[in-house]
Curated annotation (Swiss-Prot):
Lineage, uppermost ranks: Eukaryota, Metazoa, Chordata, Craniata, Vertebrata
Chain ranges of the Fibronectin type-III domain: 943-1038
Domain of life: Eukaryota
The keyword Methyltransferase appears for this protein: no
Subunit and interaction comment: Interacts with CD2AP (via C-terminal domain). Interacts with MAGI1 (via PDZ 2 and 3 domains) forming a tripartite complex with IGSF5/JAM4. Interacts with DDN; the interaction is direct. Self-associates (via the Ig-like domains). Also interacts (via the Ig-like domains) with KIRREL1/NEPH1 and KIRREL2; the interaction with KIRREL1 is dependent on KIRREL1 glycosylation. Interacts with KIRREL3. Forms a complex with ACTN4, CASK, IQGAP1, MAGI2, SPTAN1 and SPTBN1. Interacts with NPHS2.
Tissue specificity statement from the Swiss-Prot or TrEMBL entry: Specifically expressed in podocytes of kidney glomeruli.
Consequence the record notes for mutating R711H: In NPHS1; uncertain significance
Stretches assigned to the Cytoplasmic side: 1077-1241
Family recorded in the similarity comment: Belongs to the immunoglobulin superfamily.
Effect ascribed to mutating H617R: Found in patients with nephrotic syndrome; uncertain significance
Effect of I446N: In NPHS1; uncertain significance
Effect after changing L832P: In NPHS1; the mutant protein is retained in the endoplasmic reticulum
Name of the protein this chain belongs to: Nephrin
Membrane protein topology class: Single-pass type I membrane protein
Amino acid sequence: MALGTTLRASLLLLGLLTEGLAQLAIPASVPRGFWALPENLTVVEGASVELRCGVSTPGSAVQWAKDGLLLGPDPRIPGFPRYRLEGDPARGEFHLHIEACDLSDDAEYECQVGRSEMGPELVSPRVILSILVPPKLLLLTPEAGTMVTWVAGQEYVVNCVSGDAKPAPDITILLSGQTISDISANVNEGSQQKLFTVEATARVTPRSSDNRQLLVCEASSPALEAPIKASFTVNVLFPPGPPVIEWPGLDEGHVRAGQSLELPCVARGGNPLATLQWLKNGQPVSTAWGTEHTQAVARSVLVMTVRPEDHGAQLSCEAHNSVSAGTQEHGITLQVTFPPSAIIILGSASQTENKNVTLSCVSKSSRPRVLLRWWLGWRQLLPMEETVMDGLHGGHISMSNLTFLARREDNGLTLTCEAFSEAFTKETFKKSLILNVKYPAQKLWIEGPPEGQKLRAGTRVRLVCLAIGGNPEPSLMWYKDSRTVTESRLPQESRRVHLGSVEKSGSTFSRELVLVTGPSDNQAKFTCKAGQLSASTQLAVQFPPTNVTILANASALRPGDALNLTCVSVSSNPPVNLSWDKEGERLEGVAAPPRRAPFKGSAAARSVLLQVSSRDHGQRVTCRAHSAELRETVSSFYRLNVLYRPEFLGEQVLVVTAVEQGEALLPVSVSANPAPEAFNWTFRGYRLSPAGGPRHRILSSGALHLWNVTRADDGLYQLHCQNSEGTAEARLRLDVHYAPTIRALQDPTEVNVGGSVDIVCTVDANPILPGMFNWERLGEDEEDQSLDDMEKISRGPTGRLRIHHAKLAQAGAYQCIVDNGVAPPARRLLRLVVRFAPQVEHPTPLTKVAAAGDSTSSATLHCRARGVPNIVFTWTKNGVPLDLQDPRYTEHTYHQGGVHSSLLTIANVSAAQDYALFTCTATNALGSDQTNIQLVSISRPDPPSGLKVVSLTPHSVGLEWKPGFDGGLPQRFCIRYEALGTPGFHYVDVVPPQATTFTLTGLQPSTRYRVWLLASNALGDSGLADKGTQLPITTPGLHQPSGEPEDQLPTEPPSGPSGLPLLPVLFALGGLLLLSNASCVGGVLWQRRLRRLAEGISEKTEAGSEEDRVRNEYEESQWTGERDTQSSTVSTTEAEPYYRSLRDFSPQLPPTQEEVSYSRGFTGEDEDMAFPGHLYDEVERTYPPSGAWGPLYDEVQMGPWDLHWPEDTYQDPRGIYDQVAGDLDTLEPDSLPFELRGHLV
């Protein structure tokens, strides 16, 4: 309320101030010259406002002033984008319109009229535009939107601060919807002039009813349509209500022992909800409870089974929470009713007839007390005395004493003591005994075999003792010759005697004695007794000897000693006959006269004399006692112990086989008594340690165990055995098998072509088997691996592969494989070198190499040949040996297996000195061969050859040809063709320029064509291919199948018919053909010009020079096909020339190169190569049909030393040709040097 009063007073003061200023500035009547005047206005920030100004003189200049600042007569009012003049100036309307007002617009305004012809200057009264700024936010402490925890009854301070506003807002604080009266507010200046902030402070004391309610701070202002609010939720902590125990039933605390009691305890209210626990006599018994937040209830249920000792126990439930001042409690005292836990009868219910029986009955503690009564059968007996005493747990104990006379007819009746009470009407408590009245038996007898009957030992006999009457039941005791019969506790005799228990049938009692008869039962007396009564019977038992014993006159025997053995049969019924045998062989003995023995039987004896040997050791001498009447024999044996020195048995192993790196066991089969004291092994004169070693151990049986056996362990082992009687010796052989190892292999093995040779492989192996040698030939083709034409020979440790009439195809790598059954097999590679005379590559009768003869270029001549052994190359020029000491000549020689190359590099080629015929001669020990190479000038190319059709469609034809000599410069190809019946030729350049296949497109179906081919380079055109012979072609019709051979190599995809209109396509193709023809014709004309220029230059040289003659002759030469097919280098049957240019040549082999300057020859360094690889793959392919030399280099396998060129000694051979004139990219004739624009010779 105080805050509202303060705010209203501030607003009233502001209103009075504004009203006074208005009254001061604006008179009561409208001044002259104005028909409308501005008024004081109040608007909310962000709204639009209009100050009216109507002038009676429309032509006057009008402007507004803001706090004395002139805004200018411009209606757009520059510098104030939100200001503008509204209205019709012609009517004198100059209203000031302000958009989106803000605090800067809060000022005094006046409308001013300038002097004019129509009237004097005028000024309107000043008016005030008041801008109301609403508060944007409220800052609440504690923070708005949170949950604030307070304790009920305590005072707390809440602060609420408004944001900037004009005028100062009115702040109200509410809790649970009720306005808080204890509040104070302070109005402070805002962040800008004319703005205010209000800070309100309230003191709040929450109640439990405020829990989960909102505390709201509201700020109201004339600038707000509705108050703004900020709030937080109050979490009020308060203690719970007292706990209440909900007792089931009306009698609180009364309960019966054994009852399952469930007591709920409920505490309502509280924040947090109450924590409950149960106590019994002050001790916690349950701390589990549950809560129901929707009903604000805490509940705990105590579950217990009531026992008698719980009588008088105090059960209480306690409730409290974190803000409780103390613990609230509700308690109940238990009153427990419980019956006696047991009834006990003291005294014995067994008595002799006609004597008194005295008993006492006592009940355990009960609440309330119980009464006792006695029953005998269905007859109630009266007690002599009854007593009541205090018991446990507040209960009582009852006791009753009884005395009565025992009679025989009452025997077996039930005597019962019963306890009862009105509190336990549904239960009966009693204790019962069986009355036992004692009296004696009347008769006793035995049932069993009749006396005098002969029973064989082992027979099962059943004796039954019977008696009539008697209580207690007669025990019926059995006796044997005055000794009590009992079952033996020894396991071996557990089945001999079985004594049954006393059994009753009516008034008759019986007890069974079952026994298996033995010698001790013979003539024995068996008696049964029951009290003073007894009965007896006697058995007659026949039995074999109870024991047969052998007595000896000596214990230690040696071969040749005499031994006397006596056999004694202790007792038998009837008497027995004795006999001797040794391991089944019957012996004669001497019998002694019979005599009396135990168990009323008879004894017998018989002796035998033996002479022993070592073979008798361990043998058994058996004495047999036989009863003819019983048909049974009892035997006993004596084992002979003969002392003798060690003797090796016949099954002793003499040879033991083992595998290297495996184990071996040298067994011992020896016989000795006593056992050998030591086993001593020796090997090659050295004794093996009995304690064992790194690779051997002597077993307890004397056997020798070896492991990690090596071939050095092979040999004879000697064993010495010794005991106290003497020594013995044996020899065993250990045969160690080991994997084969190739010891000798002649690598390489050399043979001349057509000769014979043996490839010898010698091994070290054990065992040596006849078929353990195998041979393999290493090659890529199965045909290369066949050994059918070779002979395999094996003799002992040496295997041979014999080759007859050696051929070049048999040269290469072979592998000797030896397998004697012990892994791993041995393998080793070797090389077969087939020596043959050199064979130089003869691609054509004459090879041309072009180079510029201006003494600035270099040329390289390549000569390649095959041959074994290594080849030495020599060069001649025009038949004269070439002087390689001349620095202008450099030769590089390369060797790779049987392929050899010589590169002759001529520096500063001179037309006068070097345009000549060079001859390369390859020589080895078996012969020589040579070839010629012509060094010529750079010239126009030779005509291509072999133009043929490889594919044909209605609109295209695939062509293929072989290029001619390019003249030492890059050459290109041009195709000329014409359609029969159509005038004019068509020219097509082949793309890419150096391709040798091309697809000619744009043809018409079912049309005959003629095709020509020519080549050109920077110096001119060649003649037409195949001496100008035309190639006739007829395209198939659209419905005819197209011919496309399997080996077609098209370079451009055929452009067949498509969905485009045919006429535009034909026009486009025609335009392309015209352009192509123009280019070809232009090229021909230009080449002719160059040729005329070259001919002019050549006229100044010697017309009859030898070089020019040779060149011209060679250019016109053709391959005649007269050479032998084995030396031909082409793969087809057509006779075509072969040319080699410097641009085409690049060594395909990077072999170990050697620069031959003075000495040449085979160094033999390659003999240590680890793997021969395809040593003579290229040699094996010397004679295939029409075989070319090209694949020769592709198939050569390089060794690891051949993968790079030595950088320190040799340059990359491909760099030799870097300066060849043919490598110049000068395709334009004008850019060609003058001396290269024609033939110099």
